[in-house]
């Protein structure tokens, strides 16, 4: 039903949501015409639109585009430079720039622009592992502690020690790719 109707105005104008964020994973194969079509939606909908760099998993290779390539295409297609936005849209990893129209869009380019030093994210996988970074296979086993009756204090100490293993930087586009598929990590 979602694909067959114009549900966006109902959802986006609803009082149920403080803000709606739409994440779009980028492809290096998008033509300027396709990007223009996408920008029409970005301009039309009262949402926070974020562009996410492709992240390879299970040994897959990086397929771009990088932040600089995507920014150049957006500037070319939208007719002008993107400008820095100082407003904050949450506490996540996105950097926000404004299109020439003034509409702010977010960028999450974890491969070509490391933000590890300010990352405040971890994920709890469906099998009870706390994943410290999407781009690394480093995980902390929480489920074993819980199943073995660990106290809340012991669990908190384990989590704190694990968080200290978070890296300040990753190795960039050429780094080893995580082996766990995204569908097993959760999002």
Question: Across the structure, where does each feature detected by a protein language model lie?
Answer:
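Active-site oxyanion/phosphate-handling segment shared across diverse enzymes
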Residues: 99-127
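Extracellular/lumenal ectodomain signal focusing on beta-strand-rich modules
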Residues: 10-11, 51, 121, 132
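Flexible mid-to-C-terminal extensions adjoining Fe-S/redox cofactors in radical SAM and related proteins
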Residues: 117-187
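Single conserved hydrophobic/aromatic residue that forms the stacking wall/gate
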Residues: 1-11
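Radical SAM enzyme [4Fe-4S]-AdoMet core and its adjacent flexible, acidic
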Residues: 16-106, 110, 144
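Small/polar loops that bind or transfer phosphate-bearing groups
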Residues: 4, 26, 134
């Amino acid at each position: 039903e979602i694909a067959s109707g114009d549900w966006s105005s109902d959802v986006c104008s609803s009082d149920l949501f403080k803000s709606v964020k739409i994440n779009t994973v980028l492809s290096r194969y998008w033509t300027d015409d396709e990007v223009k079509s996408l920008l029409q939606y970005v301009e039309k909908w009262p949402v926070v639109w974020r562009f996410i760099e492709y992240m390879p998993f299970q040994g897959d290779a990086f397929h771009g585009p990088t932040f600089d390539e995507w920014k150049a295409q957006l500037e070319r297609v939208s007719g002008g430079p993107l400008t820095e936005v100082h407003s904050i849209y949450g506490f996540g990893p996105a950097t926000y720039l404004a299109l020439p129209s003034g509409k702010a869009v977010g960028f999450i380019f974890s491969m070509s622009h490391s933000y590890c030093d300010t990352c405040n994210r971890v994920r709890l996988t469906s099998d009870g592992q706390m994943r410290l970074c999407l781009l690394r296979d480093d995980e902390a086993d929480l489920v074993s502690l819980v199943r073995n009756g660990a106290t809340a204090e012991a669990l908190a100490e384990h989590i704190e020690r694990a968080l200290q293993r978070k890296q300040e930087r990753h190795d960039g586009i050429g780094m080893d790719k995580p082996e766990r598929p995204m569908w097993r990590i959760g999002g």
